[in-house]
Amino acid sequence: MTSTINPETLSGERIEELQQIAGDHMFMHAAQTNDWRGKLKVYTKGEGVWVETADGHRYLDAMAGLWYKSAGYGRTEIADAVYAQMTAIDSSPSGGATVPQVELAGKVAELYPDKGARSFFVSGGSEAVETAVKMAKKYSILNGKAGAFKVISRRYSYHGGTAMAVSLGGNAAADPMGPLMPGAIHVTNWNSYRLPYAGDPIDVAIKCANEFEEVIKHQGADTV
């Protein structure tokens, strides 16, 4: 059973026990096990932008988790709303929808310039990226471009941890895995500080746009 009530601090012995269990039985996202084995930070509390570890240290979480915690930690009003909905009905059977789902779709449409906007709700960023790519491919098929399977993205970008999302990232760390998604094409990442032709941001943007256009021409516009 997972504990849902975190104490302010844990004993040193308990922290070491948790670190040992984690080292033996967990993989951490975007981290090498040997880098944190035996010294893993065990968090017990979060409030706003602050998090606290089991040994009493307090840290500013400037990354918002892994860019997903923009609402902050310890938001009781969010927890209360989630609890209320989960005790009523937490999801809908296939082919149906809950009241909050429908209301949220309507709210998104109100905020979006295109009032005919539709929402497809998913569980996280990686799934959102993969769904967007599949929708784009389906749109191409329905509009007579059945051969448009290639997706152009920027090198050294991050789109998620699933196979398709990793393919789009264009990071060298994924190269040993071999080809993941056919048709994943990469262009220069717009970063005026690190590019070999670094300089004025406007000039860099124009060069990147020109490269993007050339890649489309080279690959064939009907395939992108």
Annotate each predicted stretch with a short phrase.
Residues 2-47, 86, 208:
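Active-site-adjacent loop/helix segments that line or gate small-molecule/cofactor pockets in enzymes
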Residues 4-8, 12-15, 58-145, 152, ...:
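Glycine-rich loop-to-alpha-helix module at the N-terminal edge of alpha/beta enzyme cores
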Residues 19-23, 79-83, 105, 209, ...:
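A generic alpha-helix structural signal
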Residues 25-33, 89, 115, 219-223:
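Short secondary-structure junctions and interdomain/linker hinges
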Residues 32, 39, 67, 74, ...:
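Glycine-rich, flexible loop/turn motifs
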Residues 40-61:
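Active-site and channel-lining beta-strand-loop segments
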Residues 52, 73, 165-169:
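Short beta-strand-to-turn element immediately C-terminal to the catalytic PLP-Schiff-base lysine
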Residues 106-223:
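PLP-dependent aspartate aminotransferase-fold enzymes
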